[in-house]
Amino acid sequence: MQLNVTHRTNAERLEKHNRELETALAKKTEEHKEQAKALLLLQDDMLANQIQLNVLEQKTEALQQENETLVQRLVAKAAADADKMNDANAFLER
């Protein structure tokens, strides 16, 4: 009789331990799902930020090229104005 009680007690302990492990597994599985969702959100944010960065880099490049063109035009105009003033001064000095 003692052997049956011992086996029953061991079986009950094992069943309880099994339930605890199943509960822990379910909890870890849920945590994993939440972490996977968070990871997907972060990856989506990172992709959106990368796209925004690419667009801004393209705009920056275009603005730098436009600025270079405008500076060249300004320098050319200043040189032309200086040439006109030099020609006018040379004419007045004659």
Swiss-Prot record:
Localization in the cell: Preautophagosomal structure membrane
Protein name per its UniProtKB record: Autophagy protein 16
Short name of any one Pfam family annotated for the protein: ATG16
Record carries keyword DNA damage: no
Listed InterPro entries: Autophagy-rel_prot_16_dom
Gene Ontology annotations for the cellular component aspect, listed alphabetically: phagophore assembly site membrane
Family to which the UniProt record says this protein belongs: Belongs to the ATG16 family.
Function: Stabilizes the ATG5-ATG12 conjugate which is necessary for autophagy. The ATG5-ATG12/ATG16 complex is required for efficient promotion of ATG8-conjugation to phosphatidylethanolamine and ATG8 localization to the pre-autophagosomal structure (PAS). Also recruits ATG3 to the PAS. Involved in endoplasmic reticulum-specific autophagic process and is essential for the survival of cells subjected to severe ER stress.
Membrane topology listed for this record: Peripheral membrane protein
Coiled-coil stretches: 2-77
Oligomeric and partner information: Homodimer. Part of the ATG5-ATG12/ATG16 complex. Several units of each may be present in this complex.
Signal peptide start and end residues: none
GO biological process: autophagy; protein transport
Keyword Membrane: yes
Swiss-Prot/TrEMBL keywords: Autophagy, Coiled coil, Membrane, Protein transport, Transport
Intrachain disulfide bonds: none
